[in-house]
Amino acid sequence: LPVIVSFVGLGRVFSSDSMPLKLLRQFTIAAYKYIASNKRCIFMFEHDRDRKKLAKLVGLEEQQTIVIDGAGINPEIYKYSLEQDHDVPVVLFASRMLWSKGLGDLIEAKKILRSKNIHFTLNVAGILVENDKDAISLQVIENWHQQGLINWLGRSNNVCDLIEQSNIVALPSVYSEGVPRILLEASSVGRACIAYDVGGCD
């Protein structure tokens, strides 16, 4: 039977150096090799870095892979709009509250710029994560908010409005993503994006 295996990023299993995840990686590779033995199987990726990495690890043939350049968004919802004028630039970080998503780096950047009397508003919207060693605790987030380092918005049901109210959207994730939806949405609205040179963000 035809099989499609779709990836929105390879995740921490393929990027972490922790022993448990290294062991899980070996089991995962073995499972993918078994799946790939079906020549009617297609492995679908959001960007070429992930495709090349997994193809090398699993031994995929090129005709078994395809790159779709992101899952896409609805441009009728995320319509282009002119930037709003603000006294200081507004930067939006909207993501799950994980250290690896790069919020800590944005905080450090804000501290450095603030010491040089350069200011911006850092709006943070996102989902708190439980039972994850990589999670940023609510206590840390509220402490940043109280120090004026961030404007904590919590979980939002209307990210489009937050993007429209921003000048810049930042997602400095330190590990390979798929193609992050928030960056696609920001680009569609016409906002500058900040990200590290990692898979899916380059």
Where are these regions (language model features)?
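Nucleotide-sugar donor phosphate/pyrophosphate-binding loop at the beta->alpha transition
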Residues: 2-4, 12-35, 39, 74
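Donor nucleotide-sugar binding/catalytic pocket of nucleotide-sugar-dependent glycosyltransferases
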Residues: 29-80, 90
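Conserved donor-binding/catalytic core segment of Leloir-type glycosyltransferases
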Residues: 82-101, 106-110, 122-123
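Glycosyltransferase donor-sugar binding loop
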Residues: 94, 121-136, 152
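Nucleotide-activated donor-binding/catalytic signature segment of Leloir-type glycosyltransferases, i.e.
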Residues: 135-156
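A short hydrophobic beta-strand element within the catalytic core of glycosyltransferases
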Residues: 170-171, 186
